[in-house]
Amino acid sequence: MEKITLAPISAVEGTINLPGSKSLSNRALLLAALAKGTTKVTNLLDSDDIRHMLNALKALGVRYQLSDDKTICEVEGLGGTFNIQDNLSLFLGNAGTAMRPLTAALCLKGKTESEIILTGEPRMKERPILHLVDALRQAGADIRYLENEGYPPLAIRNKGIKGGKVKIDGSISSQFLTALLMSAPLAENDTEIEIIGELVSKPYIDITLAMMRDFGVKVENHHYQKFQVKGNQSYISPNKYLVEGDASSASYFLAAGAIKGKVKVTGIGKNSIQGDRLFADVLEKMGAKITWGEDFIQAEHAELNGIDMDMNHIPDAAMTIATTALFSNGETVIRNIYNWRVKETDRLTAMATELRKVGAEVEEGEDFIHIQPLPLNQFKHANIETYNDHRIAMCFSLIALSNTPVTILDPKCTAKTFPTFFSEFEKICLRD
């Protein structure tokens, strides 16, 4: 297996131009495909998850031109639903941001009725989709499970989504609601969506609603408990759509600055629509010095203290707090993060396991993790298992800010969202 060893870093300094956001890139491509008119999507992320969406759209008859560096994509909108060739099968890797929204969009009524299969990597077949399928079926969709009940692969007939009253469980993933919201304007009737339980990751719903607005569709949001969407609408291309820098990817660089130097990230700022920008507020609460601009966030070292916090609203960036916690004074508790367990891997168990390898004292609960700080000279050199999970690889690069090297196994797994992560990270590292 490939691996990369990061030597101890004495300080960090510099500016990082962030790649486009994964969440925004895949939403933008799908909305542009369904919209009337041509959309030029700029600062698109070039990564595995985006490639899976682009390949799927091409197979569904969407025409687009991708620039040589793959960061600009001109999409010719269909002005409505997909034309599906019968017996088409789409392989979506482990891309939840492609699987979930496409599951809903492919249920919409096509010009001719046909069946399509959605499948992916073995891990995708372990990632639940029951709550989305249940909701779509209430709205009249025709979906079958091909292997295990509640999980991909799926067979979908494009008979249409009728709309009406739909209840959806919000407790596992906000992507289910995002998928339903994005397809609802193209349903035959108005849709009223009622959330069962507590809606997780609300800021991701804010992203969805803001982007739908950019493509000409308004949704009535009643305190995240009920959403009303008019049916029989069309998305209208805004002509150009700029994808913000990825706020989750920003977290590793900002944390490095907070631990041992000064780092600025550009492509995201105080007016960002991404919830993970709030990661900088968590660093500030821990003691770091944070500066916000229109198009940048900067983190500077100050003494860090542990924190006890509900991080349900920033589940991806919260992982970075788990490794940052080792460099603080006092214990850190990250709470209400059950949905770490249904991501690319079971992230709660994975983080606890790998943190212990570097010498940390950790307690893992059903939906929380307790982490004790570690003196710089007590870190152990470990081989970090990454579980084919890009975020684990990136989080554990911060361990090199101790006096000890860290070895990351399968570093190429960052290709899911940030193929050039390790070369970018090296740019800010200073060594004695």
UniProtKB/Swiss-Prot annotation:
It is an enzyme of class 2 (transferase). The keyword Cytoplasm applies. InterPro entries: Enolpyruvate_Tfrase_dom (IPR001986), Enolpyruvate_Tfrase_sf (IPR036968), EPSP_synthase (IPR006264), EPSP_synthase_CS (IPR023193), RNA3'P_cycl/enolpyr_Trfase_a/b (IPR013792). One of its GO terms (cellular component) is cytoplasm. The active site is at D316 (proton acceptor). One of its GO terms (molecular function) is 3-phosphoshikimate 1-carboxyvinyltransferase activity. 3-phosphoshikimate binds at K22, S23, R27, S173, S174, Q175, S201, D316, N339, K343. Phosphoenolpyruvate binds at K22, G96, R127, Q175, R347, R391, K416. Pathway: Metabolic intermediate biosynthesis; chorismate biosynthesis; chorismate from D-erythrose 4-phosphate and phosphoenolpyruvate: step 6/7. It catalyses: 3-phosphoshikimate + phosphoenolpyruvate = 5-O-(1-carboxyvinyl)-3-phosphoshikimate + phosphate. It comes from the Bacteria. Its EC number is 2.5.1.19. It is found in: Cytoplasm. GO terms for biological process: amino acid biosynthetic process; aromatic amino acid family biosynthetic process; chorismate biosynthetic process. Keywords: Amino-acid biosynthesis, Aromatic amino acid biosynthesis, Cytoplasm, Transferase. PANTHER family: AROM/DEHYDROQUINATE SYNTHASE, PENTAFUNCTIONAL AROM POLYPEPTIDE. HAMAP family: EPSP_synth. Belongs to the EPSP synthase family. Catalyzes the transfer of the enolpyruvyl moiety of phosphoenolpyruvate (PEP) to the 5-hydroxyl of shikimate-3-phosphate (S3P) to produce enolpyruvyl shikimate-3-phosphate and inorganic phosphate. This is 3-phosphoshikimate 1-carboxyvinyltransferase. The lineage of its organism: Bacteria, Pseudomonadati, Pseudomonadota, Gammaproteobacteria, Pasteurellales.
